[in-house]
């Protein structure tokens, strides 16, 4: 069932379900060309399979009746990604007639692999991107791709191709400039990154678009306790336990053995969670899943205090997802909203301060912390002073980031990066606490433990 998005984007006309069928032979030939041209790099999967050919044919046939396509002939198919979560293709079409010159020359079609992605809002996936793009474009119009169409049965989205109109060559991302550009080009690119996050932070979380986003996730996923909070929060806690050598099944110590119920008694033989890990787990959850992200409705007063340091964004802070546009067009665009969430504004700041350790080319990104990152802090926090409370929040954001990467990288080819990530994470935590004069013993001790490499 193809879903018209006309109500969300008034300029769009209803989908044309009576469009003539596409040329199957032409599509098959273009699919073969796309597969032959695609060279996946791990963890991307091979596209050379029967199932992939079937999926691509299904995607192209579905997109044919979109109003933005208007049954035009496909000229080229390019496979952009075959990751664990989704398959992404760019489809270029024959130019529109003069009467329809506003139609796009290409679109992005994205299919999500997980069968539960249309009912599970806990991680990155269909629901967060489908409803997230609507919310993000209401918060900051034009920053993210337009959503052209959605089909929950196929788990497919059709999106604006924001690379159309960027500088010549491949997509000119901030990451590309940080890797390949001159010192000045890298500095300029970081300024683009900052300008992308400035309006997102300024929009805050009090608007109707944010609450509607959370309501949409709550309706789609009846089991979501914190709809719209940061995706996959358990990663950081598992990484924390790994750091302290604690088993995953470790339990909190019982305050009163006589008051244990039957369910807790079943786990009485499980190892006890050390006090430091229990306290840090609580601190992690306080930042990742603040009270105001519980299932709506939530009284507005709960957002007035802590909510001031939260924002809605794509939830992926990689410089790869910030594109620098052509000189005569939009100067900066962002892509990939699979993880759209309400999160503490400290997370993009910490990512940049650590040199973007969550991104594929870390540690090769050239990040001038002294010149560029004070401006990022100002853009995110509107020149608020780094007081004790904010510094401790940022230290927790640092701890969460490092622990999540410990869980993700420890059994992968990137495990060799962890000593550096731990060391620099500990240094950043100490710096933040020192600048603000914080006496938080829990965070100080954690920083020491984090930096104590064996």
Where are the regions a protein language model picked out?
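ATP-binding glycine-rich loop module of kinase domains
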Residues: 90-125
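Active-site activation/catalytic loop segments of kinase-like enzymes and analogous catalytic loops
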Residues: 131, 346-385, 397-416
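Juxta-kinase regulatory segment immediately upstream of eukaryotic protein kinase catalytic domains
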Residues: 2-77
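ATP-binding glycine-rich phosphate-binding loop
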Residues: 72-99
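ATP/Mg2+ or Mg2+-diphosphate-binding catalytic cores
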Residues: 5, 259, 398-454
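Active-site catalytic-loop/activation-segment of kinase and kinase-like phosphoryl-transfer enzymes
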Residues: 26-50, 198-202, 210-301, 433-437
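Short beta-strand micro-motifs within the conserved protein kinase catalytic domain, predominantly
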Residues: 146-155
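Conserved kinase catalytic-core helix
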Residues: 168-212, 291
């Amino acid at each position: 069932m193809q879903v018209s998005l006309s109500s969300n984007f008034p300029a769009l006309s209803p989908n044309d379900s009576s469009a003539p069928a596409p040329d199957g032979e032409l599509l098959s030939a273009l699919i073969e060309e796309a597969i032959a041209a695609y060279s996946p790099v791990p963890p991307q999967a091979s596209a050379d399979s029967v199932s992939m050919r079937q999926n691509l044919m299904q995607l192209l046939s579905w997109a044919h009746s979109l109003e933005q396509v208007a049954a035009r002939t496909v000229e080229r198919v390019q496979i952009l990604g075959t990751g664990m979560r989704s398959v992404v293709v760019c489809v270029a079409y024959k130019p529109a007639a003069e009467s329809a010159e506003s139609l796009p020359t290409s679109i992005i079609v994205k299919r999500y692999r997980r069968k539960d992605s249309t009912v599970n809002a806990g991680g990155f996936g269909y629901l967060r991107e489908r409803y997230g793009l609507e919310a993000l474009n209401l918060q900051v119009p034009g920053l993210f791709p337009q959503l052209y169409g959605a089909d929950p049965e196929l788990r497919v989205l059709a999106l604006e191709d924001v690379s159309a109109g960027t500088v010549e060559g491949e997509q000119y991302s901030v990451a590309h400039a940080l890797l390949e550009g001159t010192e000045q080009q890298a500095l300029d690119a970081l300024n683009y990154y900052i300008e992308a996050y400035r309006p997102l932070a300024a929009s805050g979380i009090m608007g109707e678009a944010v609450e509607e986003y959370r309501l949409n996730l709550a309706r789609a996923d009846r089991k979501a306790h914190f709809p719209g909070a940061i995706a996959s929060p358990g990663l950081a806690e598992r990484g924390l336990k790994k750091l302290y050598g604690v088993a995953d099944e470790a339990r909190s110590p019982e305050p009163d053995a006589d008051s244990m119920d039957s369910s807790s008694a079943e786990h009485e033989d499980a190892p006890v969670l050390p006090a430091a890990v229990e306290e840090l787990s609580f601190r992690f959850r306080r930042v990742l899943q603040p009270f105001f992200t519980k299932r709506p409705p939530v009284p507005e007063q709960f957002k007035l205090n802590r909510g001031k340091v939260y924002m809605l964004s794509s939830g992926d802070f990689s410089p790869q997802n910030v594109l620098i546009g052509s000189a005569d067009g939009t100067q900066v665009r962002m892509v990939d909203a699979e993880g759209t969430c309400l999160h503490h504004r400290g997370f993009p700041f910490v990512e940049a301060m650590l040199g973007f350790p969550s991104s594929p080319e870390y540690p090769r990104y050239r990040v001038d912390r002294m010149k560029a990152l004070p401006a990022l802090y100002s853009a995110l926090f509107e020149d608020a002073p780094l007081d004790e409370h904010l510094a401790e929040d940022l230290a927790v954001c640092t701890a969460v980031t490092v622990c999540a990467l410990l869980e993700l990288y420890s059994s992968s080819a990137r495990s060799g990066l962890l000593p550096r990530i731990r060391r620099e994470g500990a240094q950043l935590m100490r710096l933040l606490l020192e600048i603000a004069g914080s006496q938080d013993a829990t965070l100080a001790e954690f920083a020491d433990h984090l930096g104590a490499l064996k």
